[in-house]
Amino acid sequence: MSHKPPKGLYFDIPLSSVYNKGMAETPSMPIIINLERTEKMEKIASFTIDHIKLKPGVYVSRKDHVGAETITTFDLRMTSPNDEPVMNTAEVHTIEHLGATFLRNHPVFGSKTVYFGPMGCRTGFYLLLAGDYESKDIVDLVKEMFIFIRDFKGEVPGASPKDCGNYLDMNLGMANYLAKKYLDEVLADISQDRLVYPE
């Protein structure tokens, strides 16, 4: 009786690399990536947003419940997706260091800050706060943070080989510039259509 293997991609991995490096003979084991399963997976929330209509702004991306606590994820979109050039990694990295430092030291939101970091597409950042918030609730906080980044001079916090895994990939001048652009063009007089995701 023959058994048909499941659909997928097959890779032969030496067992010695998994169990015992040093075996004289290393039989292989098949590693299967099931393509059918990935085809049935639902899109994550951020992939359901129409990025063609999306403008730079401050949006609630999602809300998650962990025990009795609500975690609100904000989309701090700094550039127009697939329209403006994306930010380079050096300035993104600098904004991450400065933004995280500002938030963790904030007198009100410091203890509520779960995470601040860049989107993989390099068009903005995600901010996760403990609590149930709407976009309008954090506009002042985001303004404060980007004023801090715009005006920052000197050594970027954590930009040393001891503190960071890629400390040379920094561009403070461009981080200052992008923070000013976001403040002037988006945050200064933010409209409702930049606080709620497009339909």
Feature roles, as predicted:
Residues 10-11, 19:
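Aromatic (phenylalanine/tyrosine) cluster motif
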Residues 17-19, 33-103:
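His/Glu-rich zincin catalytic helix
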Residues 81, 85-137:
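M16/MPP (pitrilysin/insulinase) zinc-metallopeptidase core fold and M16-derived inactive scaffolds
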Residues 116-188:
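Active-site-adjacent, His/Asp/Glu-enriched structural segments that form or flank metal-binding
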Residues 184-199:
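Histidine-acidic residue clusters that define the catalytic metal-binding segment
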